[in-house]
Amino acid sequence: MTKPITKIVVLGGGTAGWLSAGLLAAEHPHLNVTLVESANVPILGVGEGTWPSMRNTLQRIGIKEIDFITQCDASFKQGSKFINWRNLSEGENYYHPFMNPQGYEHTNLHASWQRIAPDQKFADVVNMQSFVCQAALAPKQLQTPEYAAVTNYGYHLDAGKFAEFLKNHCVKNLNVTHIIDDVTEVINDEHGYIASLKTNNNG
């Protein structure tokens, strides 16, 4: 391929498709980005959880956090709690907090934990976030700037509402072209690269 790419087609919507289209359009505004999705393929999933990296992704495509939270029924996610991780005893659990322990790059926290407090949970010894979660506290305060964090966080959200929210943002603010159609054929060039798509109603 020697010609510069000027047009990109994203096949498939949902959160993955619209995030891909949004990032391409936001970071490469000279490109013509089109998303093609079928009306006959429903969005999978209702609830969805993200890693903290989603905050950076939303920032990169120009989304305000308050708009995202209110329109996608989002709540903060500070980690994962695994119930009965080792056995079936009542109350036994394992926390995987999103906040990195302070100094983890410069010391062997595991060895220190085993020496100082082996009878306590690792997350409780090296990190405050499990206690924040157990107290049902948020990872930030109302006055904390959007996407900033006191403790690291991702989100729980409604996947269907998130996809619709992303679609509206990408089409209205990032000039992504939206085509609803079924793809019938993928056409490759002489080198095996995808050259074009054929659809039922748009050629």
Descriptions of predicted regions:
Residues 177-196:
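A conserved short coil-to-beta-strand element within the FAD-binding core of flavoproteins
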Residues 3-14:
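Beta1/beta-strand and adjacent pyrophosphate-binding region of the FAD-binding site
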